[in-house]
Amino acid sequence: KALNESIPVYKKLNASAMIVLIGENAEYNENNVLKCLNAAKPIVERENVTLIIEPLNNIDRVGYSMPYAKPTFELLRKVNSPNIKMLYDIYHQNMMGDFSIDDIRNNIDIIGHFHVADAPGRHEPGTGKVDYVKIIDEIEKLSYNGYIGLEYRATKPDSETLGFLNL
């Protein structure tokens, strides 16, 4: 129901993707999520809508039911829809100890969006342990043409936080 109600808004805004979260309780197990995504599949394909599933770490978001990238990739491979992809949030995967450049390489076809923030702290790149120069370089080599969202809490002016992008 929520998906059908959201699609007209999505289209009116001419949005390129609809980011969705899975949920924060035990009933959002893999079988239920798979069932829901398979139910959404014909709708999003017919309406040419892209759903992007975002795994969030369950350290900052206690109780979030889908914190890891690997099982999310496996789930999306089972759904097998060009209209259902993953938001690979580099911060969240680093917080879970699950970040892998190989995961990005092997699944770039089902990544619909990236989020960037350093870990720990969720501040701009260069304030934590994540090597964003290497990561962005690798994403470029993979010919990724989607969005990379900067989702961090800046500790200095924006003009000083974007050096990792080599703009």
Residue spans of the language-model regions?
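Histidine-acidic metal/acid-base catalytic patches
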Residues: P8, N14, T50, M66-Y88, ...
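Active-site acidic/histidine proton-transfer and metal-coordination neighborhood
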Residues: K1-K85, M95
